[in-house]
């Protein structure tokens, strides 16, 4: 869904049934460049980028949803005013990502709240296609925040992630020179 206002994705399911593969589709749910986005009670399994992805959007709620066996369970990217709560992110490479990346139509992600989620046992090997930025995310990640401002993370249950519980970083750590 691109460039829409008032998107409601409620009680939907996307799943790649052949297990984690780089040839799986990139996204389970993918609203971008949109306003007033609601993802509620959805299930995303097996995406080679993000199970639940919201990008370059504003006024977002992702709640009561399940993301499993994706590279990134839930990803909020280059977005404004998002609440991500009461979700389960498990057995992904990384549970929840809050990124702001260059060269996208909307820059300066801000005012993101991640709370009352379970980001547990994110232990799936990274199977993103080569060249994807999420291909750099280490297996066993609970939450990564990169290059955003005014991000609040509170009252989440995180366990069994193995590599990192919560990481705050800036983009330069991930840039490479040609």
Go through the PLM ranges and name each one.
Residues 5-18, 35-50, 58-72, 80-94, ...:
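Right-handed parallel beta-helix
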Residues 100-104, 141-142:
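Short, recurring structural edge motifs at helix starts
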Residues 1-2, 18-27, 48-55, 71-78, ...:
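Short glycine/acidic-rich loop motifs that flank beta-strands on beta-rich extracellular proteins
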Residues 112, 122-129, 140-141:
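C-terminal amphipathic alpha-helical segment
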Residues 132-135:
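Flexible, solvent-exposed coil segments and beta strand-coil junctions
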Residues 169-176:
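Conserved small/polar residues in nucleotide/adenosyl-binding loops
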Residues 139-142, 147:
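Beta-sheet-rich non-transmembrane sensory/scaffold domains
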């Amino acid at each position: 869904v691109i460039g829409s206002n008032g998107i409601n994705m409620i009680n939907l399911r996307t799943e790649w049934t052949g297990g984690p593969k780089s040839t799986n589709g990139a996204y389970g749910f993918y609203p971008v460049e949109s306003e007033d986005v609601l993802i509620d009670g959805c299930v995303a399994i097996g995406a080679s980028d993000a199970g639940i992805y919201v990008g370059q959007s504003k006024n977002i709620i992702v709640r009561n949803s399940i993301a499993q066996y994706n590279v990134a369970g839930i990803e909020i990217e280059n977005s404004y005013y998002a609440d991500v709560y009461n979700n389960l992110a498990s057995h992904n490479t990384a549970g929840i990502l809050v990124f702001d990346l260059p060269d996208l139509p909307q820059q300066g992600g801000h005012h993101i709240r991640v709370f009352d989620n379970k980001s547990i046992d994110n232990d799936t090997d990274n199977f993103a296609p080569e060249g994807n930025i999420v291909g750099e995310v280490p297996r066993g990640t609970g939450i990564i925040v990169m290059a955003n401002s005014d991000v609040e993370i509170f009252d989440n249950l995180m366990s069994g992630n193995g590599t990192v519980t919560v990481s705050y970083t800036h983009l330069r750590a991930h840039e490479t020179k040609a």
